[in-house]
């Protein structure tokens, strides 16, 4: 049986990264996976070669308009559309189609959170695509609807999940994530011009205003016996891609560095895509570039009485497209790690 895959939003950064990963997937090489319709809005009518010269294998493919009719007839549909647009398309696709949504439309469980941060009517919740979270891998196996997590919540959740579940910390965390400009997408913006970003760092959507704040709190709350307060600050850096997250929280009394390290090493011992670094080593965005890996370091600041956890991911791979392909693998029955690089690109 051949699985036919469509990508809506194929000309965006996430869509292009999904294509890159699918072309390296063993199922594509064997003929078990076929790349079907590639759609977008503003770039419809262009060839992929004009838009993505790094994908010469599909250079002659023409980008089509994004409609339910174009996407019908595929076994798997990846949605790389702006927030708020996915629901309209997804609701027109049949229940037998596996729909993997890279936008935020179906991530949040709390309707009030969605309406506060996104300003539209909540459309529901789908199985959430961080397989490393307790119970989520099982929910994703065979799932016909999947919500791919946000890039910031991925880095923050994987950094803090073991500490929260083990009760090492108080449920009050501070997260600072430094991100590359590709996280904002391809849309032209003065704030993202090279002359505005090069040689400069800038915090944005501070003081709890960023849309990923409730998603981080939701994820950590799943493994906590009480709600987790999250202070989240994103920082824009002059990098094409990558997220470096530093997360801190007050330690429970008596928790030692040895205990914290043991908790993290045990929690991630069987996880292919999370690597707890040796003591003293620090996560680097370059080390995970182009890979589906998350590198994590956990330390104790004894003077401050806090845990410090640092994580690094590629926002376009583990933070979006890699997670989407990982979820597809679980949904259709491929090996979970198929087609997903575990080695970064350096220098």
UniProtKB/Swiss-Prot annotation:
Active site, per annotation: 151
SMART domains: Semialdhyde_dh (SM00859)
Keywords noted in UniProt: Amino-acid biosynthesis, Arginine biosynthesis, Cytoplasm, NADP, Oxidoreductase
EC class (word): oxidoreductase
Catalytic activity: N-acetyl-L-glutamate 5-semialdehyde + phosphate + NADP(+) = N-acetyl-L-glutamyl 5-phosphate + NADPH + H(+)
PANTHER family, per the entry: N-ACETYL-GAMMA-GLUTAMYL-PHOSPHATE REDUCTASE, CHLOROPLASTIC-RELATED (PTHR32338:SF10), N-ACETYL-GAMMA-GLUTAMYL-PHOSPHATE REDUCTASE, CHLOROPLASTIC-RELATED-RELATED (PTHR32338)
Name this polypeptide is given: N-acetyl-gamma-glutamyl-phosphate reductase
Organism: Corynebacterium glutamicum (strain ATCC 13032 / DSM 20300 / JCM 1318 / BCRC 11384 / CCUG 27702 / LMG 3730 / NBRC 12168 / NCIMB 10025 / NRRL B-2784 / 534)
High-level lineage: Bacteria, Bacillati, Actinomycetota, Actinomycetes, Mycobacteriales
